[in-house]
Design a protein with these regions (language model features):
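A short catalytic or substrate-binding loop motif that flags glycine-/basic-rich loops and adjacent residues
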Residues: 29, 39-43
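Short, thiol/selenol-centered motifs that function as redox-active sites or metal-ligating centers
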Residues: 64-72
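Short beta-strand elements
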Residues: 44-54
Length: 141
């Protein structure tokens, strides 16, 4: 192994590494109750899908064409929101993601900000779909 590879494994927390390697939440949830999508000026796009039952996020997933840090942050958001109420999920902040990961480089904090912005869009969409359920079936992607 070269030094950069060794440094990557040694320089990151277990939570960061788990979110970097875990793939079960990286998927499109068909018929999601809430959906958010945001592209940054650099071209990275993050999508978040929420399944909501009885006011709680039963399942969350994401898709991105972004870098490793975009994956890690979106995966963290999907992980942290499951089981929370929509209001409880709104309490998450970029700092919540950064604190959970422990070793997200400061220059990549915009990835945490983007993931939280997309979560808020997905929550707003879920609330809109609660008020007007027929909108849930409109094409979103």
């Amino acid at each position: 192994m070269d030094q950069a590879t060794v440094d990557f494994w040694q320089n990151h927390s277990l939570q960061f590494l788990e979110m970097a390697l875990r793939t079960d939440k990286r998927q499109v949830l068909k018929d999601a109750d809430g959906y958010g999508k945001l592209s940054r000026e650099c071209g990275d796009t993050v999508e978040i899908f929420l399944m909501v039952r009885n006011g709680r996020i039963r399942s969350a997933a994401f898709e991105t064409d972004g870098c490793l840090f975009a994956v890690v942050c979106a995966n963290t958001v999907a992980h942290l929101v499951e089981g929370k109420t929509l209001q409880g999920a709104l309490a998450l902040t970029p700092d919540s993601v950064i604190d959970y990961l422990e070793t997200l480089p400061a220059e990549e904090s915009h990835c945490a900000e983007q993931a939280i912005q997309v979560l808020r869009l997905a929550i707003a969409n879920a609330r809109e779909n609660e008020r007007q359920p027929w909108k849930k079936f409109y094409a979103r992607r």
